[in-house]
């Protein structure tokens, strides 16, 4: 039976669960022997929607709470005895690719032709090379807008134009906050960037999301095989276009972030070297897994792996995937100012895009903490960090931050001082002896 139909043949599931109950001693049952009826009622199981019938548009039209419950139930059912096996791998010729040129123009091709297209671009790989892997189809306006903002921000970054923190029409993503005056900290930081050397580079967009036209493909995507395909292409860029691994940065969203991890491992297997950085933008849950192997993104898949989580109970996951994981408003259910789980997931892309614009690299100060409550009570520990393009490569652990519900999303002002870290330096700064915690 097609494992996807497990949700449509619930009577059979319940019957099997009942048989297992009589055929096995509970004390000897392993963790994978959990039955659906152990945590869902028969009525809930019978009301479950088949994964074949769920669309991105339906999730967008649901309330955040309803969509989260639906996704969580399907995810947990898929994990019981590995009910879903990964089976979908897009053909390389069907994966659209776009190479952005320094003048803002783009070259359209597909994954099969990526390396040849790169060879035709003058000076490709002389500077930073960013590989952006999309994770959802742009049939969603939220996905389309987020991806557009990211590409625009990279073009601005690579063209060396400084973007003011406030008061610029291009920066104002339709927010009334865009006309507010800059704070003193914003002005000081913006002034400091006037003498900064601009960054140059190449942007390649692998539009994996366009192949995930329904929830079935999304759920059944073979993360490892798809990542291996992209990893081999990156090796070709190194071998045939002289792109060294230390300048390759993969930025990937949603399920694409999990694919990026597999791509990084494949690159290392074939070259013996690691990619410089992988940035995960709201990495998703993995529904279909090989029961005999670990899959998805993890620290060690690149020299540095950082992740931004904005929809932990919806499209994303609260599972740590990087050297450093940033949780916006803590491991909360959804990003502030969003109305559905798709929009919430895309906020990670919007935040990262904002940090790319020259002058905004430190718009998202964060503090090492285990919860939002710890952050709000100034009980975080460790040094201040910045989420986004300016994240320090020596960071480790979980970081919490707050953001604005509308753009500009970054708080911009420095993070609040935390007692455990900054308090140790008060007596040195003031020249007075004070009791420390």
Curated annotation (Swiss-Prot):
**Annotated PANTHER family:** FI01450P-RELATED, LIPASE
Expression by tissue, per the entry, reads: Synthesized in the fat body and ovarian follicle cells and accumulate in the oocyte.
- A molecular-function term among this protein's GO annotations: serine hydrolase activity
Role summary? Vitellogenin is the major yolk protein of eggs where it is used as a food source during embryogenesis.
Region (Disordered) residue spans: 161-194, 405-437
Write down the Pfam families for this protein, in alphabetical order.
Answer: Lipase (PF00151)
According to its UniProt entry, the protein's GO biological process terms are: lipid catabolic process
Q: Induced by what?
A: By beta-ecdysone; in males.
* This protein's encoding gene: VG1-GAMMA
- The positions making up the signal sequence are 1-19
Superkingdom of origin organism: Eukaryota
What InterPro entries does the annotation carry? Answer: AB_hydrolase_fold, Lipase, TAG_lipase
Where located? Secreted
Family per UniProt? Belongs to the AB hydrolase superfamily. Lipase family.
Query: Which keywords, in A-to-Z order, does the entry hold?
Result: Secreted, Signal
What SUPFAM superfamilies does the record point to?
A: alpha/beta-Hydrolases (SSF53474)
Here the segments flagged for biased composition (Polar residues) are 174-184, 427-437
Tell me the protein's name. Answer: Vitellogenin-1
Q: Name one GO cellular component term.
A: extracellular space
């Amino acid at each position: 039976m097609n494992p996807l139909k497990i949700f449509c043949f619930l009577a059979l599931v319940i019957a099997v669960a009942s048989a297992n109950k009589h055929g096995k001693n509970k004390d000897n049952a392993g963790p994978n022997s959990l039955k659906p009826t152990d945590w869902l009622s028969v009525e809930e199981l019978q009301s479950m929607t088949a994964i074949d019938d769920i669309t991105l548009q339906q999730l967008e039209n649901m309330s955040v709470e309803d969509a989260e419950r639906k996704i969580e139930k399907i995810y947990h059912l898929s994990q019981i005895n590995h009910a879903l096996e990964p089976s979908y791998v897009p053909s390389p010729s069907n994966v659209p690719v776009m190479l952005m040129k320094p003048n803002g123009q783009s070259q359209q091709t597909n994954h099969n032709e990526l390396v040849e297209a790169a060879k035709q671009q003058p000076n490709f790989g002389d500077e930073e090379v960013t590989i952006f892997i999309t994770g959802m189809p742009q049939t969603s306006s939220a996905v389309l807008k987020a991806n557009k903002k990211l590409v625009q921000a990279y073009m601005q970054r690579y063209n060396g134009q400084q973007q003011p923190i406030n008061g610029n029409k291009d920066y104002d993503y339709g927010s009334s906050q865009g006309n507010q005056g800059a704070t003193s900290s914003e002005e000081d930081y913006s002034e400091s960037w006037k003498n900064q050397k601009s960054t140059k580079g190449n942007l390649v967009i692998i539009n994996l999301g366009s192949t995930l036209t329904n929830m079935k493909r999304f759920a059944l995507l073979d993360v490892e095989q798809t990542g291996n395909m992209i990893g081999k292409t990156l090796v070709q860029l190194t071998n045939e276009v002289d792109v060294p691994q230390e300048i390759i940065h993969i930025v990937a969203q949603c399920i694409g972030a999990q694919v990026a991890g597999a791509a990084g491992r494949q690159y290392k297997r074939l070259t013996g070297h690691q990619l410089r950085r992988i940035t995960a933008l709201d990495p998703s849950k993995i529904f279909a897994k090989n029961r005999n192997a670990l899959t998805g993104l993890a620290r060690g898949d690149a020299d540095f792996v950082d992740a931004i989580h904005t929809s932990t109970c919806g499209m994303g996951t609260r599972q740590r995937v990087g050297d450093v994981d940033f949780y916006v408003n803590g491991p909360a259910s959804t990003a502030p100012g969003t109305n559905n789980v798709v929009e919430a997931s895309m906020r990670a892309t919007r935040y990262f895009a904002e940090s790319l614009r020259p002058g905004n690299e430190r718009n998202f100060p964060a503090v090492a903490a285990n919860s939002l409550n710890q952050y709000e009570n100034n009980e975080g520990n460790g040094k201040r960090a910045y989420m986004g393009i300016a994240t320090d490569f020596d960071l480790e652990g979980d970081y919490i931050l707050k953001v604005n519900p509308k753009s500009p999303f970054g708080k911009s002002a420095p993070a609040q001082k935390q007692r455990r870290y900054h308090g140790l330096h008060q007596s040195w700064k003031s020249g007075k002896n004070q009791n420390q915690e």
